[in-house]
């Protein structure tokens, strides 16, 4: 794939993304095709986006062709877990020096690939370009092609230098690498009538493991996971699925639309967070396949799981009812976590629209109602203002906002990719309720909100002086 201005515009203009236009491709929004403005890569560049989209392929090696900082500063930032191979946990880099920048890094890249393949025997090697190697003009395609032929191992170039744009664009560039070099290159041993792919699910904190057993009970086979806890081979035969389940549409919508065009695989956008959304997801899958027996199994499973959940969540609902929440996250979580909190009787008073599509925003408006606040930007000052204005009891956000909550002396729950607790599916709902309850009712908040001893002493001293003066 040649990374040209036209290709970037194509990735930024997706027919399935209602922020660009509706699903029929009408009403194109030209602003979506503009190149990245200075500063747009803050908080995650295109290289970072491509790597976090592809690194969860667990039996592949991931080689960063660039300076040591590109690999070191971003490695393992997303807590995607594996049920098998741990190759993806090892970071590989060509560690370019000044001499390599001057004379070119292609020879060093080839040597790095050779050493990696001989020593670790990965199922495949993904090679990531970075700002430096893109600027000096190293030919990744030629090196990867030669190495593939020599070592009979798929060596896949990923053209996502950081300067081309934001993390979201990098996600899509990672998806393009899969479409160009991986998907459709192998065939599964067999297929079933209910084969699906999960796209945009990264198994953060192992939360996908709470959802897969549900599909197994229903007789639905997850043919390929793109890319959480995935094996390289399963991504190769993902083109034989009957339905794509899009979990994070902002990130890999290009994969869903391209697979629909090339292989005729339709897609639906769903969420695994919250009882209502999980129920809706299972029902929509059954509705798509149109199988009466599957629909019956889905309804039976929903009844069983919701009955167990009602019992498990009863004490948490009683303790969390009426608590006010400010939610600051991005993408699908900006509305799906709202639904999960409302299932627990909590009131979400504000949420962010960072990285949200127009369809996401419509869902947020429906969930929050007319009084809900939608945050376009969430600087610490703005978040503190909203917390004070809404009298919020809790801030649910990413780890970088933890100190904002501490300043406001309110409880905080980490909801982003750095977290260590799974919140997806029915089991994840119980875990989320437990974490919310522990955060809100921790005794520390009663203590930190008390006046300091010296303030108490000062007040008592002033009161004593006033009495003496009288």
Curated annotation (Swiss-Prot):
One GO term under biological process is: protein-containing complex assembly
Q: Which SUPFAM superfamilies match?
A: Helical backbone' metal receptor
- Tree of life domain: Bacteria
Ranges that cross the membrane:
none
Where are stretches of biased composition, namely Basic and acidic residues?
18-27
One Pfam entry name? Oxidored_nitro
Pathway participation: Cofactor biosynthesis; Fe-Mo cofactor biosynthesis
Write out the entry's keywords from A to Z. Nitrogen fixation
Region annotation Disordered: residue ranges?
11-35
This protein's record includes keyword tRNA processing: no
State the Gene Ontology terms under molecular function. Answer: nitrogenase activity
Role:
This protein may play a role in the biosynthesis of the prosthetic group of nitrogenase (FeMo cofactor).
Instruction: Return the NCBIfam families for the record.
Output: nifE
Task: List the PANTHER family.
Answer: NITROGENASE IRON-MOLYBDENUM COFACTOR BIOSYNTHESIS PROTEIN NIFE (PTHR42956:SF1)
Q: What family is reported?
A: Belongs to the NifD/NifK/NifE/NifN family.
| Name of this chain's protein | Nitrogenase iron-molybdenum cofactor biosynthesis protein NifE
